[in-house]
A protein has these predicted regions:
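Accessory carbohydrate-binding/adhesion or oligomerization-edge regions at the termini
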Residues: 30-116, 196-231
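Short beta-strands within extracellular/lumenal beta-sheet-rich domains
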Residues: 128-139
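Aromatic-lined ligand-binding clefts that engage carbohydrates, nucleic acids, or primary amines
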Residues: 145-160, 194
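N-terminal secretory signal peptides that target proteins for export/translocation
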Residues: 1-11
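Beta-strand-rich ligand-recognition modules
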Residues: 161-210
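Short structured motifs
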Residues: 118-122, 133-135, 178-182
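Non-cytosolic beta-sheet module surface loops
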Residues: 140, 149-153, 198-200
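Bacterial N-terminal signal peptides
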Residues: 11-27
Length: 231
């Protein structure tokens, strides 16, 4: 009996050690994109009380240089990968840009803004003189007229909704809530594809985005997903 018990104790120790390693691995995975970004939870995401969109697919950064209006427009209009203005990527999808293979990553942010510096740094990618692409899907239960897209970014950014350019802000700037606001638009019933290109010169880089209702209050009543919901 004693010899059997002696075998069991090391086995239990090994199992406990494995459990601790698994928990540590899970914790590391949750923090894979820095202290404010995590892998998305299951199911659709609703905007918070202030209306900010917190779920995105982000492509690893592409080298780019220039923050003036003309430079940024030239950067974002350049062809980097197939269907860059129409693709709805999946987490883990890869694209080839020049000689580099870049990956799309799904993230949820814990804050109102998406910290691109944390994102890139955590992946060992450059944070200066780079271009980030971001995509999300806004799902509306009904048509929503008279709304506006309100964005902020560090540094410059250009934004598209359902393939149409809505708003851009330029220069070496800090992220300010509602720094750029689009004209009034209508969100379609069903999925609406929101796409952003953020260009950073150096230092910190992040962005935030929300929709404002006809009274310029945070829009509610929609969900955010990273795939078009099945009909």
């Amino acid at each position: 009996m004693n010899s059997l018990r002696n075998y069991r104790l090391p086995a239990l120790g090994i199992l406990a050690g494995c459990a601790l390693l698994a928990a540590a691995a899970s914790s590391c995975f949750a923090q894979a994109f820095g202290p404010t970004l995590t892998s998305p939870t299951a199911g659709p995401k609703t905007p918070g009380a202030d209306g900010f969109i917190s779920r995105w697919l982000i492509l690893e950064p592409i080298p780019a240089n220039g923050l003036t209006d003309s430079a940024v427009q030239a950067i974002v209009k350049k062809d980097y990968f197939p269907d860059q203005f129409t693709v709805i990527p999946h987490d883990g999808d890869k694209v080839t840009v020049g000689s580099a293979t870049l990956t799309w990553h799904a993230v949820d942010t814990k804050l109102y803004n998406v910290n691109l510096y944390h994102f890139a740094y955590s992946l060992g990618k450059p944070t200066s003189n780079v271009l980030f692409w971001a995509v999300t899907i806004v799902n509306c239960p009904r048509e929503m007229p008279g709304v506006r897209l309100a964005i902020g970014s560090n540094a410059a950014s250009v934004w598209w909704l359902n393939g149409k350019e809505l708003v851009g802000i330029y220069g070496d700037r800090q992220t300010v809530i509602d720094d750029g606001v689009s004209k009034r638009i209508t969100l379609n019933k069903g999925p609406n594809i929101l796409r952003a290109a953020v260009v950073n010169g150096g230092g910190a880089t992040d962005f935030c985005a929300r929709f404002l209702d006809p009274d310029d209050k945070p829009l509610k009543g929609y969900t955010v997903t990273l795939a078009v919901p099945a009909k």
